[in-house]
């Protein structure tokens, strides 16, 4: 969709009435790019000691990681005594850390590193600061701390302080506000990392209090947690910016649980989504040293550069092909560059193609394939490469042209008095594309040109009025990236532009329902753009509509709602996703596993996040001339963990 795809990426459809407040950020100069470093937890859990910590910190320097930006070295849980000192101060476990924290801070600072400490908003075990925030902040500063990771264990009084509570009785912002205020009173700047596992949608309030916030539950030593984490990141990518970074959790690279391609995918996506890059493996201790392949991944300068890019804009999800097992993310970089990632969710290696219009581009003068180590020049419309099972095609694109624009010098070739433009892209098969032809200079007198799309189409004669430098016409195109447009002309052409049809929107209110599916009215300004939705779609409950169209493949944008956040389920099957299927004229359904859309608290926000719409596009084949029966549901949902589909707001068919 030349001009449409650049706009329909995966956007929260609260676009008409954004109920999110302005997100203030700390103005202390810290974390202008995402923080990088190393943390004890993923490998050593709550059992770190001084020897382990010093050895790994030294490895940051010895392995060249510190020079690349990995400078925060953090001791996570397990460093405190169970009781405070007589004056109320926290102290370290002298058995595990005999030199003491001030000496450890000095050691790190002498290495050119920064000292990270760990605390907790609760009452016990993790280094609790509840009702001791100012005292603890002053203590951390006196020890020479440079950052504080602040957890939320044992904090829910109404339930007797369980270790973890995913549905607290009150909002979490006030609890973190106390420590944030205490840190801001210090003379020493301390990076504040909010870690309450994504509960209460911290993206709305954490940027005003800290420099990063955990978007979800812990990453686990299982490949499926990467998909789960990315699905939770989708509605939060636009919250990222200098001084405020969504934290996808510490890296598993080097822990021996992911394959090399999986580690490359994990590292690539954490980097381009602007997550803090915190190593969670053993770099070097008395018995363990990180393997060379994982170290190579952690030291990949281009990928680190995308994470630390001065523009500070996160990549976002652009397209997902659930049935085919791959998806595309992309985002802008400084100096007009673009980064794109094509993830292969299947377990086998295969060739995958990136259609550049899916990321808002039509061509690139230079494409770097980072993990393949290759470079291509003058790439037009699409790029194909081999991708390992569970691997990622990570690309940097330079010298790009926006989607829908076809300069003659790139796409055109002369043929007599004509010009042939190749590799013209169309998201849908449609008769309603708009072609704009740009001439090198103003046409002095009336003339005519002819346009032919493909080899077998009838030629179209277009009158060119005098004193014009551009003329437009409506043309047919076939879905795909191999359309050709031949223009016979007597005046020089510089470029053509192709704009997709606007499409027709069909709100869910126009669909009839079966089974338990029901229409629900949402709060004012929500469930955009309709104001209502269909919920409880399942294998036996559907929404059915009749949509007129021409024959062929169509690009369809679906407005959906999903806020089934995986908290306790994240340790097992939870994926932060729900399915939607579209069946056309009784044919095989197209399945789309949609990520979260909620942009408000799942506990206290309007509609508990179930009124926040997002949009995702899918190609649907099998349209016929005339009326088409469209069924939205969750075919085969009974076979998995998702019996209910995402809620359905409406869809737009581009024809």
Swiss-Prot record:
<keyword id="KW-0964">Secreted</keyword>
<dbReference type="InterPro" id="IPR002241">
    <property type="entry name" value="Glyco_hydro_27"/>
</dbReference>
<dbReference type="GO" id="GO:0000272">
    <property type="term" value="P:polysaccharide catabolic process"/>
</dbReference>
<feature type="glycosylation site" description="N-linked (GlcNAc...) asparagine">
    <location>
        <position position="502"/>
    </location>
</feature>
<dbReference type="InterPro" id="IPR017853">
    <property type="entry name" value="Glycoside_hydrolase_SF"/>
</dbReference>
<dbReference type="InterPro" id="IPR041233">
    <property type="entry name" value="Melibiase_C"/>
</dbReference>
<feature type="glycosylation site" description="N-linked (GlcNAc...) asparagine">
    <location>
        <position position="87"/>
    </location>
</feature>
<feature type="glycosylation site" description="N-linked (GlcNAc...) asparagine">
    <location>
        <position position="432"/>
    </location>
</feature>
<comment type="function">
    <text>Hydrolyzes a variety of simple alpha-D-galactoside as well as more complex molecules such as oligosaccharides and polysaccharides.</text>
</comment>
<dbReference type="GO" id="GO:0005576">
    <property type="term" value="C:extracellular region"/>
</dbReference>
<dbReference type="InterPro" id="IPR013785">
    <property type="entry name" value="Aldolase_TIM"/>
</dbReference>
<dbReference type="InterPro" id="IPR013780">
    <property type="entry name" value="Glyco_hydro_b"/>
</dbReference>
<keyword id="KW-1015">Disulfide bond</keyword>
<keyword id="KW-0378">Hydrolase</keyword>
<feature type="glycosylation site" description="N-linked (GlcNAc...) asparagine">
    <location>
        <position position="482"/>
    </location>
</feature>
<feature type="glycosylation site" description="N-linked (GlcNAc...) asparagine">
    <location>
        <position position="540"/>
    </location>
</feature>
<dbReference type="Pfam" id="PF17801">
    <property type="entry name" value="Melibiase_C"/>
</dbReference>
<feature type="binding site">
    <location>
        <begin position="196"/>
        <end position="200"/>
    </location>
    <ligand>
        <name>substrate</name>
    </ligand>
</feature>
<protein>
    <recommendedName>
        <fullName>Probable alpha-galactosidase D</fullName>
        <ecNumber>3.2.1.22</ecNumber>
    </recommendedName>
</protein>
<dbReference type="Pfam" id="PF16499">
    <property type="entry name" value="Melibiase_2"/>
</dbReference>
<keyword id="KW-0325">Glycoprotein</keyword>
<feature type="glycosylation site" description="N-linked (GlcNAc...) asparagine">
    <location>
        <position position="93"/>
    </location>
</feature>
<keyword id="KW-0732">Signal</keyword>
<feature type="glycosylation site" description="N-linked (GlcNAc...) asparagine">
    <location>
        <position position="579"/>
    </location>
</feature>
<keyword id="KW-0624">Polysaccharide degradation</keyword>
<keyword id="KW-0326">Glycosidase</keyword>
<keyword id="KW-0119">Carbohydrate metabolism</keyword>
<feature type="signal peptide">
    <location>
        <begin position="1"/>
        <end position="16"/>
    </location>
</feature>
<dbReference type="GO" id="GO:0004557">
    <property type="term" value="F:alpha-galactosidase activity"/>
</dbReference>
<comment type="similarity">
    <text>Belongs to the glycosyl hydrolase 27 family.</text>
</comment>
<feature type="active site" description="Nucleophile">
    <location>
        <position position="151"/>
    </location>
</feature>
<feature type="active site" description="Proton donor">
    <location>
        <position position="218"/>
    </location>
</feature>
<feature type="disulfide bond">
    <location>
        <begin position="126"/>
        <end position="153"/>
    </location>
</feature>
